[in-house]
Curated annotation (Swiss-Prot):
This is Aspartyl/glutamyl-tRNA(Asn/Gln) amidotransferase subunit B. Allows the formation of correctly charged Asn-tRNA(Asn) or Gln-tRNA(Gln) through the transamidation of misacylated Asp-tRNA(Asn) or Glu-tRNA(Gln) in organisms which lack either or both of asparaginyl-tRNA or glutaminyl-tRNA synthetases. The reaction takes place in the presence of glutamine and ATP through an activated phospho-Asp-tRNA(Asn) or phospho-Glu-tRNA(Gln). GO terms for biological process: glutaminyl-tRNAGln biosynthesis via transamidation; translation. Heterotrimer of A, B and C subunits. It catalyses: L-glutamyl-tRNA(Gln) + L-glutamine + ATP + H2O = L-glutaminyl-tRNA(Gln) + L-glutamate + ADP + phosphate + H(+); L-aspartyl-tRNA(Asn) + L-glutamine + ATP + H2O = L-asparaginyl-tRNA(Asn) + L-glutamate + ADP + phosphate + 2 H(+). The gene is gatB. GO terms for molecular function: asparaginyl-tRNA synthase (glutamine-hydrolyzing) activity; ATP binding; glutaminyl-tRNA synthase (glutamine-hydrolyzing) activity. It comes from the Bacteria.
């Protein structure tokens, strides 16, 4: 029997506000444990929450960016559960009236585009953080408690691990462009749970789902889904049944293990938050927030293709992160050719960032010095090979491209007389290569070009070397 996989993703994103959603405590990552707290976060008796307007507006902006309808009337609810990192014994969330509903984003997998529906986007507060030690006790940090979150719930439209990965990449890119979050999974500002079920191909009814947690990277989301697909298929083929449960992805083994039997909404005993009034959002407020949304990656990608003549793949890669896209645009403003700037950013720059595990702003590169280097290549001052040395110097230490070339003595040798002298000397020492060339062995030319480049430490003008080398060999 063959099965179809059905996946829905729940993505939590921390909003980049200065203070928490219901208290005045700072909402910054990395502080000493239990220092970013107030009596509201600690759940002290008699304290009252105060709604952070900026968190609401960030939620509206994110919802609009993923094509959600914004509610005219929304409210907050209490989700009741007891856990050490939740001092109040309830979480303030949104149950039946979320701030955004009925959205969608478009993904592309294997050259095919597909719309993934968004069921809802709602606001809520984050919980604290438990650290379980090997000594039989746990440490609780309340700093994260009350940090504003949006939860984005997809429709069960995803059919493979690859589609789930593409959905997360696209969602991260869109949220990043809006500026409401830095969406860094390594810092916990973007987290994902996956709901997975399988059903016989052709069956309309959904199978019993399991929820996967501890998915701390996009790759782990993919691996967890792939494992769970196989596990559920093996259970059904052996005559077993799938239990509705929550499972943990174990990164070390690549497998999932039981955490607990999955709760339903009734288990949380939702009821309207009595300490917060309902929220009404009028058209004027919506339009003001909509006007703040910048050009999003899909539109920017189309502009790069139509206006700059970039290939679709280049446009997609350049717009994947806002930092890379903004850097590219600033490089064009600084005078660089669009295709050359694209090639450098997608090639050497991306390779350097991956190898060094850095982001653009953590290097010495600027749009101005990258554009300056590209202009030096176009002017023939340096070759593409020399440019790689210049690039590394700029990436590591910053500075001006032209000054680096002067200081390092990297100006390309384009003097015909100097090159002819070097070529003549190399031909005198490699007479067999001349014979091979005249016998039709083209590899001999490549060897001799390499000898010239070696003699000039890579600074000879390559097209001129080829031209002069052929001229000198034909004279002999």
């Amino acid at each position: 029997m063959n099965f179809e996989t059905v996946i829905g993703l729940e993505v939590h994103v921390e909003l980049k506000t200065n203070s928490k959603i219901f208290s005045s405590a700072p909402a910054h990552f990395g502080a000493e444990p239990n220092t970013n707290t107030t009596v509201v976060d600690l759940g002290m008796p008699g304290v009252l929450p105060v709604l952070n307007k900026r968190a609401v507006e960030f939620g509206m902006k994110a919802a609009m960016a993923i094509n959600c309808e914004i509610a005219e009337h929304t409210k907050f609810d209490r989700k009741n559960y007891f856990y050490p990192d939740n001092p109040k014994a309830y979480q303030i969330s949104q149950f039946d009236k979320p701030i955004g509903e009925h959205g969608w984003i478009e993904i592309e997998v294997g050259g095919k585009k597909k719309k993934i529906g968004i069921t809802r986007l709602h606001l809520e507060e984050d919980a604290g953080k438990n650290t379980h030690t090997s000594h039989g006790y746990s440490l609780v940090d309340i700093n994260r408690q009350g940090t504003p979150l949006i939860e984005i719930v997809s429709e069960p439209d995803i059919r493979s691990a690859e589609e789930a990965y593409a959905y997360l990449e696209k969602l991260k890119s869109i949220i990043q462009y809006t500026g409401v979050s830095d969406v860094k999974m390594e810092e916990g500002s973007m987290r994902c749970d996956a709901n997975i079920s399988i059903r016989p191909i052709g069956q309309e009814e959904f199978g019993v789902k399991t929820e996967l947690k501890n998915l701390n990277s996009f790759n782990n989301v993919r691996k967890g889904i792939e494992y769970e697909e196989k596990r559920q298929a093996e259970v059904l083929k052996s005559g077993g049944i799938i239990e509705q449960e929550t499972r943990r992805f174990e990164e070390a083994t690549g497998k999932t293990s039981l955490m607990r039997i999955k709760e339903g909404s009734d288990d949380y005993r939702y009821f309207p938050e009595p300490d917060l009034v309902d929220l009404f959002i009028d058209d004027a407020w919506k339009e003001r927030i909509r006007a703040e949304i910048p050009e999003l990656p899909d539109k920017r990608q189309i502009r790069y293709i139509n206006d700059l003549g970039l290939p679709a793949y280049d446009a997609m890669v350049l717009t994947l992160t806002k930092e890379m896209s903004d850097f590219f645009e600033a490089t064009l403003v600084a005078g660089a050719d669009a295709k050359q700037a694209s090639n450098w950013l997608m090639g050497e720059v991306s390779a350097y960032l991956n190898a060094e595990q850095k982001e653009l702003h953590e290097t010495g590169l600027t749009p101005e010095n990258l554009a300056g280097m590209i202009k030096l290549i176009e002017a023939g001052t340096i070759s593409s090979k020399i440019a790689k040395k210049v690039f590394r110097e700029l990436a590591q230490n910053g500075g001006d491209a032209e000054q680096v070339v002067k200081d390092k003595g990297l100006v390309q040798i384009s003097d015909e007389g100097a090159l002819r002298t070097i070529i003549s000397e190399i031909l005198d020492n490699n007479e067999q290569s001349i014979v091979d060339f005249k016998n039709g062995k083209d590899r001999a030319v490549g060897f001799l070009v390499g000898q010239v480049m070696k003699a000039t430490k890579g600074q000879a003008n390559p097209p001129m070397v080829n031209k002069l080398l052929l001229e000198e060999m034909n004279k002999r």
